[in-house]
């Protein structure tokens, strides 16, 4: 990981990418990141630095204003510089509770404009502000307890109960994931606007990725629903 400390900063589109912790935006489908020209790579890096420098204060201000619990609002932005990773971004927290937003180099290179980068930052930051990691953990625990309890009550074996608990945890974690993505799209659009970027322009990346549709246990809503959510946020903001 290459942290952006060198920038003087304090411091998740789609086939869904499973993260061990945190939340992520789905991946953009590519056969592999195309090698960038030096000038193209430099332009992408400069655009990313510009976006982070404007989005970070907007993100942290929104976090401080909206938080209902004593969560950490000192965001850290990092870049995963490992070669060969597909375009992706995600939000997680470190051992102290500090929020971290990570980006792969390929996502930075794939973004067509600063609005797309800004919207991704706003979306991922919103997952932390809205408490989605804790809510995901709670939902997973609830699903595990309920399904495991049902199997236990019916006389299931220890192995069967453990399997049911694992299945229940996965079901619980996915149950509200689409709603959480839409919530993050809405607040992310507001944060993007507050930083001076255009979230509707930024959300156009949805038009370039496979549509996850409306699968019952899917982790992401349809692209049309997400673009409509961004448009709704912009209309409400105005």
Region locations from a protein language model:
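Post-HEXXH active-site segment of zinc metalloproteases
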Residues: 132-163, 203-206
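Bacterial N-terminal signal peptides that target proteins for export
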Residues: 1-2
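DG-centered beta-turn motif at the end of beta-strands
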Residues: 123-124, 184, 222
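C-terminal motif of bacterial Sec signal peptides marking the signal peptidase cleavage site
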Residues: 8-11
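Long, well-structured alpha-helical subdomains associated
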Residues: 177, 195-238
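Metalloprotease/metallohydrolase-associated module, dominated by Zn2+-dependent proteases
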Residues: 155-201
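Peri-catalytic and regulatory segments of divalent metal-dependent proteins
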Residues: 13-142, 194-195, 215-217
């Amino acid at each position: 990981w290459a942290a952006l400390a060198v920038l003087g900063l304090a411091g998740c589109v789609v086939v869904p990418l499973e993260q061990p912790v945190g939340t992520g935006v789905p991946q953009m489908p590519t056969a592999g990141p195309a090698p960038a020209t030096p000038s193209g790579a430099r332009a992408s890096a400069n655009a990313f630095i510009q976006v982070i420098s404007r989005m970070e204060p907007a993100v942290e201000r929104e976090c401080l204003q909206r938080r209902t619990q004593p969560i950490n609002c000192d965001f850290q932005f990092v870049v995963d510089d490992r070669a060969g990773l597909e375009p992706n971004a995600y939000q997680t927290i470190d051992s102290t509770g500090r929020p971290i937003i990570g980006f792969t180099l390929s996502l930075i290179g794939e973004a067509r404009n600063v609005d797309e980068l800004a919207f991704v930052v706003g979306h991922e930051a919103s997952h932390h502000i809205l408490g989605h990691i804790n809510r995901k953990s709670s939902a997973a625990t609830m699903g595990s307890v309920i399904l495991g309890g049902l199997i236990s009550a019916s006389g299931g074996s220890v192995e069967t109960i453990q399997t049911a608990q694992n299945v229940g945890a996965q079901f619980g974690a996915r149950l509200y994931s689409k709603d959480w993505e839409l919530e993050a799209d809405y607040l992310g659009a507001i944060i993007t606007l507050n930083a001076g970027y255009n979230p509707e322009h930024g959300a156009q990346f949805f038009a370039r990725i496979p549509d996850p549709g409306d699968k019952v246990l899917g982790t992401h809503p349809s692209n049309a629903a997400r673009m409509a959510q961004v448009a709704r946020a912009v209309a409400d903001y105005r």
